[in-house]
């Protein structure tokens, strides 16, 4: 009873939450028999919402009810608010706690002062003879053992493997470049072309992909015709004959730059143009005719044909043309200069596009490429043929 008297004295002193520790243990039996106390009673409550830890199986600790002594979780409590206008970090677009509005990519902003230097460097690399395949390597080096039809079949198979492994377009373009440059330096048996194509994809994936497939995957894609040891040995041969120059610019390298320069944005029309240009660039890999052109010329031709195919009533070079041409050309002569340089490339690319896409004959299996998810976004019912005039 002395403990009860002490509790009453405490209540009178202005402590409505009661006492803890020994005072709880000393509650008289008759006081407990009267039933649980109210939350603001002088002695500790036995209910889960009291100031003491709950005895329910699911309770993890002190009660979270708003009327207990613990911190409140209601929005108007002292804790940080989650309302948009509160000071505790708003998620609304205009709030100071982190805007959701799109902002320019920091990497893109950082590279702006060096765009012309990068362009000049890439164009110097693509023109180096050590990084270029021979135009007539089939006759000069291979001696007719490998013809261009066989090359087309090989490239087509490589495109299929790249699709199976979900490789980037850059990886496929690098791999085809490795094959052409390798065959320009050494006579190679035709019955091992699949080993060469597989290994070229393996080397390119190491250079371009974040998570390249394992060598076992490339061995398995040949139905285990070639072992992992043979693929690894072929990898060393390719790197040795290429002098380890595996980072040469390709058509995709310049095409990405051209699309960014003259067609920036993410709207649907620009997306269609990107898909069309990528598709034309892949088609150009199949034909040996395009080996003679610099990658930047083929990329410009793909952009020209792609823009004209999607918008036949517009002039393809209108809009930011000067940004994709050599810096020494004045704006007035840009259009004539570029069209004259890519004329021969542009002249045959539409016919290749028409034949390969809507014909079941030939070595290409580009019906498979059309099944790719991105090509399904690009329906073209009546493609426009670009005449020589």
From Swiss-Prot:
* Pfam families from the UniProt entry: Cyclin_C, Cyclin_N
Which is a GO BP term held by this UniProt record? G1/S transition of mitotic cell cycle
- Which residue ranges have biased composition labelled Low complexity? 19-43
Q: Which InterPro entries match?
A: Cyclin (IPR039361), Cyclin-like_dom (IPR013763), Cyclin-like_sf (IPR036915), Cyclin_C-dom (IPR004367), Cyclin_N (IPR006671), Cyclins_cyclin-box (IPR048258)
**What keywords is this UniProt entry annotated with?**
Cell cycle, Cell division, Cyclin
Q: Disordered: where is this region?
A: 1-103
State the GO CC annotations. Answer: cyclin-dependent protein kinase holoenzyme complex; cytoplasm; nucleus
Q: Which GO terms describe its molecular function?
A: cyclin-dependent protein serine/threonine kinase regulator activity
Q: Which cystines does this chain contain?
A: none
Question: So what family is this one in?
Answer: Belongs to the cyclin family. Cyclin F subfamily.
Q: What is this protein called?
A: Putative cyclin-F3-1
């Amino acid at each position: 009873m002395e403990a009860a008297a002490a509790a009453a004295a405490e209540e009178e002193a202005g402590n409505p939450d009661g006492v803890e520790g020994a005072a709880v243990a000393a509650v008289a039996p008759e006081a407990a028999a009267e039933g649980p106390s109210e939350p603001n009673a002088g002695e500790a409550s036995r209910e889960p919402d009291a100031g003491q830890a709950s005895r329910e199986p699911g309770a993890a600790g002190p009660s979270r009810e708003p009327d207990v002594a613990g911190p409140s979780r209601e929005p108007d409590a002292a804790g940080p608010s989650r309302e948009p206008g509160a000071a505790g970090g708003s998620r609304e677009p205009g709030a100071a706690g982190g805007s959701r509005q799109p902002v320019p990519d920091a990497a893109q902003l950082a590279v702006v002062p060096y765009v012309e230097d990068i362009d000049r460097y890439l164009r110097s690399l693509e023109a180096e003879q050590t990084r270029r395949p021979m135009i007539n390597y089939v006759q000069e080096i291979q001696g007719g053992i490998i013809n261009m039809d066989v090359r087309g079949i090989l490239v087509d198979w490589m495109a299929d493997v790249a699709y199976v492994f979900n490789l980037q377009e850059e990886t496929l373009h690098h791999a085809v470049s490795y094959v052409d440059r390798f065959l320009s330096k050494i006579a190679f048996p035709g019955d091992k072309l699949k080993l060469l194509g597989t290994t070229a994809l393996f080397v390119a994936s190491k250079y371009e992909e974040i998570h390249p497939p394992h060598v076992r995957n490339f061995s398995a894609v040949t139905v285990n015709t070639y072992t992992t040891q043979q693929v690894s040995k072929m990898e060393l041969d390719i790197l040795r004959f290429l002098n380890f120059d595996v980072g040469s610019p390709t058509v995709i390298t310049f095409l990405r730059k051209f699309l960014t320069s003259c067609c920036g944005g993410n709207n649907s029309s620009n997306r269609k143009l990107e898909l069309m240009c990528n598709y034309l660039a892949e088609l150009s890999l199949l034909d040996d005719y395009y080996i003679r052109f610099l990658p930047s010329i083929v990329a410009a031709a793909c952009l020209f044909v792609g823009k004209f195919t999607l918008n036949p009533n517009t002039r393809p070079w209108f809009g930011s043309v000067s940004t994709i041409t050599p810096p020494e050309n004045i704006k007035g002569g840009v259009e004539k200069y570029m069209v004259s340089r890519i004329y021969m490339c542009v002249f045959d690319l539409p016919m290749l596009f028409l034949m390969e896409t809507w014909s079941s004959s030939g070595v290409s299996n580009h019906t498979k490429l059309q099944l790719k998810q991105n090509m399904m976004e690009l329906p073209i019912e009546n493609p426009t043929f670009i005449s020589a005039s």
